[in-house]
Amino acid sequence: MASTTVCSAARIRVASSQVLRSIANTRTYATTSPESSIPETKPTAKRTPTTFKDKLNKGPSFSDFIGGATEPPLSPDEAYALKTALVGPAGKKKEITRLPSWLKTPIPDSSSYKKIKNDLRGLNLHTVCEEARCPNISECWGGGSKAAATATIMLMGDTCTRGCRFCSVKTSRTPPPLDPHEPENTAEALSRWGLGYVVLTAVDRDDLVDGGARHFAETVRRIKGKAPNILVECLTGDFSGDMEMVSLMAESGMDVFAHNVETVEALTPFVRDRRASFQQSLSVLRGAKAANPELITKTSLMLGLGETKEQVLDALKQLRASQVDVVTFGQYMRPTKRHMAVHEYVRPDVFDMWKEKAMEMGFLYCASGPLVRSSYKAGEAFIENVLKKRAKERIGGAVEDSVKGKDVLL
């Protein structure tokens, strides 16, 4: 009986192993394909020429480079035409406009740049260089052997109560309260940076009774107290047209009073916040000059927003009639997709033309170029072309008076 049971168990094991082998032979796996689905191997076809190879074949040969170009150079219109490119994955490519070569700038990296940036973070200070994404930050903060570093400090926080359509600064109807330590912190930072020229600007604070003018003016006084040799330019808002606050700022001890009209009068309603106007900006500039006739007044316009030549000329005439001393022209560059689109990339020779026009009209100085901003390289351009000139005239007049026996106070 026992032997019969053992034999039966052996037969079952043999049968089971045969079934398992059969199943294993017919099982399919995710990494294998049915024989019928395996494609036949075909000889590799000759690779089709790529777009890049086609361009090389159609382009100039080595002998062309040696022998010199035989075709005439591009016209200015062709040379400065907008460059486009397709970017993105297949099926979702988008056409983008490439920046012209004259609008490209180096990545910021220098010891002066790093020192300024670290101090800003440590003292909780802001700059319009960063907030407005200025393309010149590496050049201005870095300085050089022939030019002092410049920086534009943005006072009263990083949140503006207005919403201009060209500006990337944050906006809010109720921004945070003012930092009472900011005037002293700003003066302390600037006194140890070794700057030759500083530009102070501020967000608009329509939520404050004085628009922040007293806070702004106190900062100027603190800076002059700690570093009297630093030249201070103040780029102010319009203080809602309050001439008392404009006068307070003009008499704070600054060297340059700047207020930007930003664009031509016809485009102002479409470019700037509805609370700003071209005529109100002119009144601010006139008010500053009236409060302090020795003050240099300055403004800036962006080009590339769709303005016409006649509109720019009209703006210059009105600015000169308002006794504005200095004007700058720069290319408008769209900071984000939610801001106004660029209407045109203005050619460098057009900027040169506007500089000549401004100087012919009697402006003391004009900085004009695609990358010029209101405070662009102020320490280099402004000191050399305006402030030093006035200082020499003042010294010359003092010497003449001294020769005549008059009491002179320099």
From Swiss-Prot:
Reactions accelerated catalytically: [[Fe-S] cluster scaffold protein carrying a second [4Fe-4S](2+) cluster] + N(6)-octanoyl-L-lysyl-[protein] + 2 oxidized [2Fe-2S]-[ferredoxin] + 2 S-adenosyl-L-methionine + 4 H(+) = [[Fe-S] cluster scaffold protein] + N(6)-[(R)-dihydrolipoyl]-L-lysyl-[protein] + 4 Fe(3+) + 2 hydrogen sulfide + 2 5'-deoxyadenosine + 2 L-methionine + 2 reduced [2Fe-2S]-[ferredoxin]
Family: Belongs to the radical SAM superfamily. Lipoyl synthase family.
Cofactor notes: Binds 2 [4Fe-4S] clusters per subunit. One cluster is coordinated with 3 cysteines and an exchangeable S-adenosyl-L-methionine.
Organism annotation: Arthroderma otae (strain ATCC MYA-4605 / CBS 113480)
Cellular component terms per the entry's GO annotation: mitochondrion
Cofactor: [4Fe-4S] cluster
Binding site for [4Fe-4S] cluster 1: C129, C134, C140, S375
The name this protein goes by in its record: Lipoyl synthase, mitochondrial
